Amino acid sequence: MMKVRKILFACIIGGVLFIFLLLKYNPRNNRAYLENRIGTEVSRVYPTQNLEDLFEQFPNGFIVYQAHLMNENIVKIKLTGAEKGAPIKGELIETERKSGENTRVVSVEYYNGKYTFSDEKAASELWPQQSFLFQKITLNKDFLSTLKLKDKYYSSMNGSFELNYDVNLPETNEYLSFPASKTIELSFGGSNSNRNYYYSVVVEDKDGYYFRETVYE
C-alpha cells in the first residue's frame, strides 16, 4: 500500500512539474511572438480616422467600445457598425460606480465622418475627446518593439495573452488630457479563443486611472 502511495505521489509531482514547465517555457510566452501577434492585428485598426473605413477590415460589421473613469463614475460609449453605408449608432452612458445607476444616457450617431449626439452639452462633458483613440494613434509590431516592456502573459489553458508597457507617449497623453511628460502603463490583450477580431488597449496610471478601448467583430 505504501509503495502505491509513493508511486501516486511521484505521478502527481511529475504532473505538476510538467504543467509548470509547460507554462513557464511555452514558446508563445515570449515578447517577439506576442508583439508580432498583437501588433499585426491592432495595426488593422490603429490608425483609422473614419469609423466607416472599419468596414474594409470587418465587412460583416463591428463594435467599438470605450470606458474611462471620471471622478466617482465610469463613462462608457459603445457604437455598432451593422451595415456599410448606414449610420453607426450607439450610446454614451455615465454610470455611478457604487450604485451601478445610469445618471446620463446620450444617443450617438456617426455618419459621413461626423458624430452627432442627442445631448451635445452632456456629450462634451462626458466625452470631451469626441473621438476614439484609434483615430489618433498608430500601433504596429515595430512600434511595440521599441517600448519598455513591463510584463507579458500567455495562458496555455485558454489562449489568452497580454503585453504591458511603461511608456511616455505624447499623443496618448494629449488624447487623455494628461501632462505631456506623464508615464503610463499601456496594455494590450486578446485571446486565441476568440475566432473573430477582439483586441483591447488599456491605459492605467499609479493614481488609479483606468481607460479601455476595445474593437471587435
Report residues per predicted region.
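Short, Lys/Arg-rich N-terminal segment immediately upstream of the first membrane anchor
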Residues: 1-4
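N-terminal Sec/ER secretory leader and immediately downstream segment
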Residues: 54-83, 88-93
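Acidic, serine/threonine-rich low-complexity disordered tracts
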Residues: 182-217
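N-terminal leader/targeting segments and the immediate start of mature chains
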Residues: 6-70
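An acidic-aromatic
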Residues: 78-131
